[in-house]
Swiss-Prot record:
Catalytic activity as recorded in UniProt: L-glutamyl-tRNA(Gln) + L-glutamine + ATP + H2O = L-glutaminyl-tRNA(Gln) + L-glutamate + ADP + phosphate + H(+); L-aspartyl-tRNA(Asn) + L-glutamine + ATP + H2O = L-asparaginyl-tRNA(Asn) + L-glutamate + ADP + phosphate + 2 H(+)
InterPro entries: Asn/Gln-tRNA_amidoTrfase_suB/E, Asn/Gln-tRNA_Trfase_suB/E_cat, Asn/Gln_amidotransferase, Asn/Gln_tRNA_amidoTrase-B-like, GatB, GatB_C_1, GatB_Yqey_C_2, Gln-tRNA_amidoTrfase_suB_CS
Name listed for the protein in its UniProt record: Aspartyl/glutamyl-tRNA(Asn/Gln) amidotransferase subunit B
Annotated keywords: ATP-binding, Ligase, Nucleotide-binding, Protein biosynthesis
Length: 475
């Protein structure tokens, strides 16, 4: 029996508002536990929620960027459940009238594009955060009442790789809109994955398992890969898949049962009595739509059409708004687009990945990178020398021209000076000349290496090659 994998994702995104969704409590990350909460967040008797309009605007903005239809009439509902991190014993969410529906985004895996549907996008409040220790459990209610959007995909993904690509694209779009920073390490983007298997050709879905506590896109992919294998083994051996919630354990690289999955009936949804229905007219929608900036796909197309970048470069540069904005500022300062792209995708990304940092954490600026790239273009420094300048720029900052002067890194492009060096090297390496004339091309590489060594890497490489061949042909 051949089985087909069905994957759908539920993504929670914390909105970057200054106050919480139903109270004036601040939303700063990293504050002392239980210092950013109020009687409204904690559900004290007699208090009433007040809807944060900015949260609604942000939700609409995200929904529009994800090609959703925006509701004209929407409302809030109570989702009833009891956990220690939920002091009210209910969560204010949206059940049957979400703010956005029927959206989609396009992903690309192995060169093939695919549209993934988005069932709905709705607003809700976040819960507190529980921390379990050997001595007991602690609860921080700072997160309680933070504004969230939940984005529910259609079950359109068929592989864990597609799920990864979907998350990467979704994160990129949301970051570009500016409604969230989408930092998984800070909990501002969280993902639950639903996966089931069914015989190829069957329309009815199989019984799904939900994977929770997936704190990176890589864990989402690995968790789905393991669950795919687990369910396949169970079904092929005649077993039955139970509807349950599981978590991915990185140590064992397996998914582990957490609990039997609840259905929506278990939450006893009913309309939130303390909030009126919300009506969104066309003028409000257009006001929000006008605030949406250029999104990654449009920016990618512009890089290819206007700047002449390869599609791959454009894709990598637009994955994050931070990198794309840095690229734009560097090119706007006069640097060549392709050369800038090469440095950002090469040395810059390699440094950031190795140091586990973001662009905002390093001393390199668009103006600094632009000046360095222009020095390469002018022939003042070679690409090899530029790496020494780059190391200084990204660690300490500064002016590339001043760094080049202070360290004596100016490229030697004077033909007379280089010809003297070449002549001296050839005089001391007659065997290499013979080897080259006898067809051993590697000999030229050796000679170039000796010249670069003699000039401390500062010789102009194209000019060295030209002079070297001229001098060899004279002998």
């Amino acid at each position: 029996m051949n089985l087909e994998t069905i994957i759908g994702l539920e993504v929670h995104v914390e909105l970057k508002t200054n106050s919480k969704i139903f109270s004036a409590s601040p939303t700063e990350f990293g504050a002392e536990p239980n210092t950013q909460t109020s009687v409204i967040d904690l559900g004290y008797p007699g208090v009433l929620p007040t809807l944060n309009k900015e949260a609604v605007n942000f939700a609409m903005k995200a929904a529009m960027a994800l090609n959703c239809e925006i509701a004209t009439e929407t409302k809030f509902d109570r989702k009833n459940y009891f956990y220690p991190d939920n002091p009210k014993a209910y969560q204010i969410s949206q059940f049957d009238k979400p703010i956005g529906e029927n959206g989609w985004i396009e992903i690309e895996v192995d060169g093939k594009k695919k549209r993934i549907g988005i069932t709905r996008l709705h607003l809700e409040e976040d819960a507190g955060k529980s921390t379990h220790t050997a001595d007991g459990s602690l609860v921080d209610y700072n997160r309680q009442g933070m504004p969230l959007i939940e984005i529910v995909s259609e079950p359109d993904m068929r592989t864990p790789e597609e799920a990864y690509a979907y998350l990467e694209k979704l994160k990129s779009i949301i970051q570009y809109t500016g409604v969230s920073d989408c930092k998984m390490e800070e909990g501002s983007l969280r993902c639950d994955a639903n996966i089931s298997l069914r015989p190829v050709g069957q329309e009815k879905f199989g019984t799904k398992a939900e994977l929770k506590n997936l704190n990176s896109f890589t864990y989402v992919q690995k968790g789905l890969e393991h669950e795919q294998v687990r369910q396949e083994k169970e079904l092929l051996s005649g077993g039955i898949i139970q509807q349950e919630t599981r978590r991915y354990d990185e140590a064992t690289k397996k998914t582990i049962l957490m609990r039997v999955k609840e259905g929506s009936d278990d939450y006893r949804y009913f309309p939130e009595p303390d909030l009126v229905e919300l009506y969104i007219d066309d003028a409000w929608k257009e006001e929000v739509r006008a605030s949406i900036p250029e999104l990654p796909d449009a920016r990618k197309a512009r890089y290819v059409a206007e700047l002449g970048l390869p599609a791959y470069d454009a894709h990598v540069l637009t994955l994050t708004k931070e990198m794309s904005d840095f690229f734009e500022a560097t090119v706007a300062d006069g640097a060549d687009a392709k050369l800038t792209s090469n440095w950002l995708m090469g040395e810059v990304l390699a440094y950031l990945n190795k140091q586990q940092k973001e662009l905002k954490d390093v001393a390199l600026t668009p103006a600094g990178l632009s000046k360095m790239v222009q020095l390469i273009e002018k022939g003042t420094i070679s690409s090899k020398i530029a790496k020494k300048v780059f190391n200084e720029l990204i660690e300490k900052g500064g002016d590339p021209e001043e760094i080049v002067k202070a360290k004596g890194l100016v490229q030697i492009s004077d033909e007379g000076t280089l010809r003297k060096v070449v002549t001296e090297i050839l005089d001391n390496n007659e065997q290499s000349i013979e080897d080259f004339k006898n067809g051993k091309d590697r000999a030229i590489g050796f000679l170039v290496g000796q010249i670069m060594k003699a000039t401390k890497g500062q010789a102009n490489p194209p000019l060295v090659n030209k002079i070297l061949l001229e001098e060899i042909n004279k002998r």
